[in-house]
């Protein structure tokens, strides 16, 4: 399956081959037919990832506070390792899509295979061939 990912450290975008999602309880697997690219929202995400570490810190003081709290709790080196690890994890882009239900998880029986649906939610309704989406999104 193909999915648009962004590398947070460098800001680079890639269309990557990733494993297909499977339905779990409370949601459905959807084969995307279309996904929305927002010139505003996604530009902000892309611009943020392209900033230096200092630029990211200036832009997101809430994350700086989380890092400082982690340093107090866990120490400097474990925090540095956690931050670098998170920066190396690519993130899926997108938050709005439409498609056809392929699989239904337990607790989402109001949907059925073949249903056409609109989906929303960052981290769920991404630019990908297929997505797993909780039933309320």
Report each predicted region and the residues it spans.
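Extreme N-terminal starter segment of soluble prokaryotic enzymes
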Residues: 1-3
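Conserved hydrophobic/aromatic beta-strand scaffold that supports enzyme active sites
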Residues: 5, 15-17, 98-100, 130-132
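Extracellular beta-rich ligand/substrate-recognition surface
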Residues: 5-12, 93-95
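Short N-terminal binding/cap micro-motifs at the start of the first secondary-structure element
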Residues: 10-15, 38-41
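Residues that act as N-cap/strand-start positions at coil-to-secondary-structure junctions
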Residues: 12-15, 85, 125
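Glycine-rich beta-strand-centered segment in the early N-terminal region that forms part
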Residues: 21-36, 45-123
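Glycine/charged-rich beta-loop-alpha catalytic/anionic-binding loops adjacent to active sites
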Residues: 81-82, 135-137
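A structural motif shared across PLP-dependent enzymes of the aminotransferase-like
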Residues: 121-135
